[in-house]
């Protein structure tokens, strides 16, 4: 990408890395990426822990960092090895996910229009997608490494990610369409004039329901889900280039 853009490595001012599957507890993987890419030590490295909404959150963060003009060029790196976060014996959840990464380049431009965003947080539902142990609140014990049967084809450890599929589905159906409409109203956008609707690739059935609620034609709503599964924070950029 840098070669295609004609950007020298020494011109990168900041990298923003978004992931739920960092290499280590410490240090931030963003710092390791700076070294692996051979970027200068003057490059600011920031790491954001986010999943489904990660690319949008990262894009907002990277754009905000360069908007003032002090930092000129940014790389937004989004990637997850989601399959490693789930039990290999959880046949209900693990097959839904794929591993992927993306890189988005941003550059300060004095005549560029401002990027507009609609954000929100619902912290009360944090257990809808949840890994019970492994952080500082609940340290791993020997018992947490034992597999527990939760149902047919569902063997998980406490260190494995769990997902309340029905709650996630209900959230997507109720919140996503309203969020898009609020964005359109806030910035006076005519959704009928939009070229594409790129949705996080969580569930085809759910996304089709959202598409219909927003009156987007099928050809304006691309998918990468069939080929790559749910690729977490990378799903939107993966869909854009697919």
What residues fall within each predicted segment?
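Conserved active-site "lid/cap" helical segment
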Residues: 1-13, 140-195, 206-210, 214
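Acidic, glycine-rich active-site loops and adjacent beta-strand->loop/helix elements
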Residues: 18-24, 50-53, 78-83, 120-122, ...
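Claisen-condensing/thiolase-fold acyl-transfer catalytic domains that form or cleave C-C bonds
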Residues: 21-22, 35, 40-42, 47-70, ...
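Acidic-glycine-rich active-site phosphate/pyrophosphate-binding loop
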Residues: 25-38, 76-82, 145-152, 206-218
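Short acidic, glycine/serine/threonine-rich loops at helix termini
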Residues: 26-28, 60, 86-90
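Flexible, glycine-rich active-site loops centered on histidine and acidic residues
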Residues: 67-101
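Condensing-enzyme catalytic core mediating Claisen C-C bond formation in acyl metabolism
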Residues: 90-170, 174, 178
């Amino acid at each position: 990408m840098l070669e295609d853009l004609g950007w020298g490595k020494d011109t990168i001012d900041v990298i923003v890395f978004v992931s739920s599957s960092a290499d280590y507890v410490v240090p931030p993987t963003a710092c390791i990426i700076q070294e692996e890419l051979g970027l200068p030590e003057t490059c600011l490295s920031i790491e954001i822990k986010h999943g489904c909404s990660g690319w949008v959150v990262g894009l907002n963060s990277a754009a905000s960092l360069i908007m003032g003009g002090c930092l000129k060029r940014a790389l937004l790196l989004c990637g997850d090895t989601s399959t490693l976060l789930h039990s290999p014996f959880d046949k209900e959840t693990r097959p839904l996910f794929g591993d992927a990464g993306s890189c988005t380049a941003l550059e300060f431009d004095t005549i560029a229009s401002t990027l507009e965003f609609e954000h929100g947080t619902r912290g009360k539902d944090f257990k809808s997608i949840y890994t019970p142990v492994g952080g500082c609140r609940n340290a791993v014990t020997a018992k947490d490494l034992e597999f527990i049967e939760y149902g047919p084809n569902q063997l998980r450890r406490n260190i494995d990610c769990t997902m309340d599929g029905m709650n996630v589905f209900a959230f997507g159906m109720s919140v996503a369409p309203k969020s898009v409409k609020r964005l359109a109203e806030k910035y006076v956008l005519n959704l009928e004039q939009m070229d594409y609707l790129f949705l996080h690739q969580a569930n085809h059935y759910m996304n089709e329901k959202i598409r219909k609620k927003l009156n987007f034609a099928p050809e304006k709503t691309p998918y990468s889900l069939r080929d790559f599964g749910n690729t977490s924070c990378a799903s939107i950029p993966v869909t854009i280039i697919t």
